[in-house]
Amino acid sequence: MAQKLWEKSVEVNKDIERFTVGRDREMDLYLAKHDVLGSMAHITMLESIGLLTKEELAQLLTELKDIYASAERGEFVIEEGVEDVHSQVELMLTRRLGDVGKKIHSGRSRNDQVLLDLKLFTRTQIREVAEAVEQLFHVLIRQSERYKNVLMPGYTHLQIAMPSSFGLWFGAYAESLVDDMLFLQAAFKMCNKNPLGSAAGYGSSFPLNRTMTTELLGFDSLNYNVVYAQMGRGKMERNVAFALATLAGTISKLAFDACMFNSQNFGFVKLPDECTTGSSIMPHKKNPDVFELTRAKCNKLQSLPQQIMMIANNLPSGYFRDLQIIKEVFLPAFQELKDCLQMTTYIMNEIKVNEHILDDDKYLFIFSVEEVNRLAREGMPFRDAYKKVGLDIEAGHFSHDKQVHHTHEGSIGNLCNDEISALMQRTIEGFNFQGMEQAEKTLLGRK
């Protein structure tokens, strides 16, 4: 059985070991590739300060690239009796290279190692989330342009209120994603700082070159203060979780709208038949399960920041094992959000809209404000116009040609989709993912 990195002469009670390891072996599979990348940067730095020879570095890099490839193929496993990904990688290197494999932990603690793994994993996942958001954004903008002249009711208090349009509806969610991406970008910038070299949270007596590992891994900067680097555990995950929750909030609201508008009582949109499910008893049913599940999953994601805060709340500075539990709720959250984004993108691209909603006379009164404004433009004081139209409605005399004349920025007749698209493009460029991508390729010896 593999020896633990911290093992001494006393054997730990097996029940205690099982409880303390928990789901770490399962969760650390998310981090395997990133742990290897971090080790590659670390040993390159160790060679530069004389703690490894060039030959030892070459041997280690060869084996680490092989381990990385196995993780890419989904073949990397954490063996029974091995606590975590860090221990597994070191064990594999020691088996292959003997004492040389035991040198990779010099100047490093599992504390800064897992901090690094989490940051490398998280920034990669943020990039994938951003790509998925961008795809949904473009679908929404296309649909907004396609249906910009199709009117629909706007609601306040779930009562018919004023004319809206599908151009506004699709475009509103597109612009919401821009603000969500700004939040995600801020979380990315806080995440994209190098904690490596902080060791257990108090640095090392080795002359570590932290700037070198920062550059090798493509970080924007580093967490300078080693105590703060460790304090960032839990804080980074919480900040990112807030960004994910913000995105999830937008998708949840869109899913609610789609479910409601798809119902026969509204009949504003129609989901593709292949995207609905049936009933075991009612043969006519076409249920929007995909959006109901999206809504539930996104609502669950919105609880993620609170879960993380409750785990990390009231911890003093320094490392505590409580932080391990955050991985269980944090690491899987990215895939859940990406799944929701993918499904929403697909269905929003295929959804059909009812182009004759306002032909129904029950929506006539949504044009009341249009009539008030017409009278005001003709010179009648607004309050008098408001009163006249109200009395006409009560008397059953109200009529309108069901035309709207909105021209200001962001209105039915002037959606400003080009401006919204430009905002999204600038936001995407602000992430600057190229630096991290190129650094990782260089470490792996890939073009």
UniProtKB/Swiss-Prot annotation:
GO terms for cellular component: cytosol. SUPFAM superfamilies: L-aspartase-like (SSF48557). Gene3D superfamilies: Fumarase/aspartase (C-terminal domain), Fumarase/aspartase (Central domain), Fumarase/aspartase (N-terminal domain). Its main location: cytoplasm. It is found in: Cytoplasm. It catalyses: 2-(N(omega)-L-arginino)succinate = fumarate + L-arginine. Pathway: Amino-acid biosynthesis; L-arginine biosynthesis; L-arginine from L-ornithine and carbamoyl phosphate: step 3/3. The keyword Magnesium does not apply. The keyword Amino-acid biosynthesis applies. Keywords: Amino-acid biosynthesis, Arginine biosynthesis, Cytoplasm, Lyase. GO terms for biological process: arginine biosynthetic process via ornithine; L-arginine biosynthetic process. CDD domains: Argininosuccinate_lyase. It holds the Pfam family Lyase_1. Belongs to the lyase 1 family. Argininosuccinate lyase subfamily. This is Argininosuccinate lyase. The gene is argH.
